[in-house]
């Protein structure tokens, strides 16, 4: 187990593991201000490469989060759904798995995509949009927690990404045998991005 500390505005932590030994990202925790710690774990000693991307997140007059790239161009806002995000970064997205879940425990969305990047890497990521509702209180205009998770892959191959819709309890009318839901509903999904030209 290792704790990796870094400083970033709104981080996307990714890792490259070519050793054949599974490495799991357990958690990413804010330790104050722009300081973060990501904990990774493997069952035996292993070396990995990791990358931390810090997005420039600004809040405009409508209180929506806007993500800008290094050129100052808006890439995405917290009100965008996945089809719009795909249009904004058209040509770089090679796969997407948008989905919507309510009273649903288990694999929410899973997809695979083949890739052969031109000398770059493939980003495997997830974005949870701000339509999460907890016990009747709508959390609007925010991305909760980390923007993304996943890793880079070089060369050619197949990437698979899955997300889960967790329950928040204790009241669940559907199904009755799962008593862990605050009437939660959230949009989520995964994207595969060819970052070789970015």
Please describe what each predicted stretch is.
Residues 1-2, 41-135, 143, 163-198:
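Extracellular receptor-binding modules and their adjoining Ser/Thr/Gly/Asp/Asn-rich linkers
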Residues 1-35:
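An N-terminus-focused feature that recognizes amino-terminal "leader" regions
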Residues 20, 33, 72, 136-137, ...:
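Intrinsic-disorder/low-complexity loop/linker signature
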